[in-house]
Amino acid sequence: FGQVFAFKDNKGFSVGVRGPVSVHQAVSISPVDIESLQITKSVNGEKKEKGENRASDTMGMKHFVRFGLYQIKGSINVQLAEKTGFTEEDAATVKECLRTLFVNDASSARPDGSMEVVRVYWWRHNCKEGQYSSAKVHRSLEIRLRDGVLAPSTPEDYEYILHPLAGLEPEVMDGV
């Protein structure tokens, strides 16, 4: 992970700090349908000011996805890990955090049981430079809809296919 520190003096400047862990944006495997629900408040708690009409109930929209399978990719840069003191224990903590990402994470946006980590694939190279590029490793996992599935609604509607890379075997863990 990294950080940008902004400083203000006579001249504004910022300093970027790079960390060894890189986490990409999650991307849906199949297109998702975004549904909307209109919401209102049931009680008007706003006071009427002199000369003003009472405020009407606030109405808004809540948008949600009933089902989506998302893939997130990442990596750990060994050179930056050495420079920053990132350890094997830290890597194990990141791995466990990914596996348990949605444990005790319920909210109105993510009701309990609505989000889960299906599986974590964790590759460990046998050298600092890596046996393969991150892009090649990421492409070695293919996720696609099973034959005959038109509208996926569960993770089981997908096939998870590992294309072997010689000398590099992932650790595969189920999420919690």
Question: Which ranges hold each PLM region?
Answer:
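RNA-binding basic/glycine-rich loop and surface signature characteristic of RAMP-family CRISPR effectors
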Residues: 1-176
